[in-house]
Amino acid sequence: MTRVLIAGIVAGVISIAAGPRFIDFLRRKELGQQIREEGPERHVAKKGTPTAGGILILLAATIAFIALSKYELTGLTVLFVTLACGAIGFADDFIKFTHKRSLGLSGRWKILLLACVAAITGYLAHRAGLSHLTSVLIPGTSYRLPLGPLWYVFIFLVIAGAANGVNLSDGLDGLAAGTAIISLFTFTTMAVLTFIRSARTPSLRSPDKLDLAIAGAALIGAAVGFLWYNAFPAEVFMGDTGAMALGGAMAGFAIMMKAELLLLFIGGVYLIEALSVIIQVLTFKYLGRRVFLMTPIHHHFEMKAWSETKIMVRFWIVAGVLCSVGFALFYLYYLPPRV
C-alpha cells in the first residue's frame, strides 16, 4: 500500500516542479489555444494560453508508475489506454497548432484509432485473466448481461465515450482536471478495497489490483500538480492530449475492474456534458429550436452569467455526488464477498 501513496506523491511533485519550465517551453514554441469563433465572448481572452499541458500529466504519471509498479497486466493495460488515447489527443492538438485552427483530427480518424485502442485493450483484458470477461454486471442487481463478441464493441463505446466526454468538459479552467481527480480517486479506492479483500481471501480468482491503485494514484498526483497551474485563471490548458488521456484512463479502470456501467455514475459529469450536445443537435435538427443557450452544458451556465469558478465548483460537487453513488453500488454489488 505504501507504493500507492508514494506513486501519488512522486507524480504530484514532478508535475508541480516541472510545471513552470514546461509552460515556458509551450510559450516559446507558441503552442497556444485556438478559440472557437462561436464560443462565449469572454473566452477570447484565453486565446494563446499554452495548451497540450496533458503532456505534463502523462510524463509525471508514467514516471511514477514505472518507478513503483509491480508490472501486473491490469495496471499496464490502464497505462496503455491512457497513453494511447493521449497520443490520439496529441495528434489532434498538433494539427491545431500547425494549422492555427480550433479543429484538429477528423472524427473519422479518431473513431478508427480509438477502435484500434479498444481492440488491443480487449486482448490485454483477456490475457489478464479477468473473470466474466465478456459479460457486464448491471448495477443494482446480481445479473450479468452476456455480450459475447459484442463486448469488444461495447468497450469501444466505453473508451470512445469516456475520452470524448472528458474532452467536451475541458472548456473551463479547472473543470476537467478537478472532476477527473474525483473520478480517479473513486476508481483508485475501489482498486485498493478489491486488493485488500482479495489478499485476505486467496480462493478468490482476481488479478492483482494493487497495480491499478498505483496507476490511479500516479494519475491523481499528476492531475493535482497540473490543476495547480490550470486553476482559474489558467496558466495552461490540458488540451486534447490530457482530456482524452484522462478519459481513456477512466475507461481503462472501468474495464479492468469489470465495472463498466459504473462509469455512468463515476464519469457522470462527462455523460451530462455529452448528452447536452446530443440533445441540442437533435432538437435543433428536428424541432428547429435549442434547449440550451450553448453546449456543452457548462457554456449554457456561462451564458447565464455564472462565473467560471462557480460553474467549476458546482460541477465538482455534482461529480462528487455521482461518484459517491457509483462507489456505493460498487461496494454493494461488485466488491468480492468476505469469506
Regions found by a protein language model. Name each.
Residues 1-27, 57-87, 121-127, 134-137, ...:
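Alpha-helical transmembrane segments
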Residues 36-49, 100-113, 303:
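Juxtamembrane helix-capping/reentrant segments at transmembrane boundaries
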Residues 96-106, 136-145, 307:
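Membrane interface segments of multi-pass transport proteins and intramembrane proteases
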Residues 97-98, 128-131:
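Short, well-ordered, mixed-charge alpha-helical segments that flank or form enzyme active sites
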